[in-house]
């Protein structure tokens, strides 16, 4: 695999070169400005191209080494793009309001995440919130929704991220300051009104246009996926050539799967699939419904079946990361 390709023409078509009005600028961005046209600063794309490449390389290297990338974009036009890109690349995101202390007070945030998971178990588990009055269930449901909106994108992060990718450092200034305080590198899109100081991987570009944001997120997601592939290679894992998992042979619909063979039930004691990143009790149940009960089955998935299972459980792009995890967890079980 390789880093995603892009051209200056793509950047132009997405409007990456358009900055803010010339009176709304940060003089520290002067080295990245090509000139002024119709009272609008024009960003020098000859600098954006290599800067973006460096940022993508940092993302890929971080993921290849087993690190976590946190996408941060809470402005309206970035929210959906950021969440989609993070999900597809098995990474994490904050696209609602950045809560002060999300990084610097991780212990408290972890407690809130634990509360979110507890509420989900209470409201969607076998008891379905029984034992509570209708009003109490409504209150708990509202609390769950509020926590999920704020923390849903980092609920499975398990610790501090190793790299932040930020859209608009002015709006996300608290996130940037927290990362800098903890020594976490930041890759960021910097418009002409931003401050590049302290940004490890600055990428001069339009941080307002929807098409530009979509392009950035797509490229960063693909860079993260490249890192996942490189990480597998470094571990000597060939996803399509894993040793066959120890599962019972059952007749399946011809052509339904590439090589995966579902089980009608666990062979002995089922493995705790919730140990895989992003697997909640609900996702584990969906995997069981598909005939997946053991880490060995996940470790043996080829790319086609991994993609299909991801689509079935509603986490496209996440299963590739599970394959490497399952390989290690399967060895521990043995």
Curated annotation (Swiss-Prot):
Keywords: Ribonucleoprotein, Ribosomal protein. The keyword Chaperone does not apply. One of its GO terms (biological process) is translation. One of its GO terms (molecular function) is structural constituent of ribosome. InterPro entries: Ribosomal_uS2, Ribosomal_uS2_bac/mit/plastid, Ribosomal_uS2_CS, Ribosomal_uS2_flav_dom_sf. The keyword Cytoplasm does not apply. Pfam families: Ribosomal_S2. One of its GO terms (cellular component) is cytosolic small ribosomal subunit. Belongs to the universal ribosomal protein uS2 family. This is Small ribosomal subunit protein uS2. It comes from Xanthobacter autotrophicus (strain ATCC BAA-1158 / Py2).
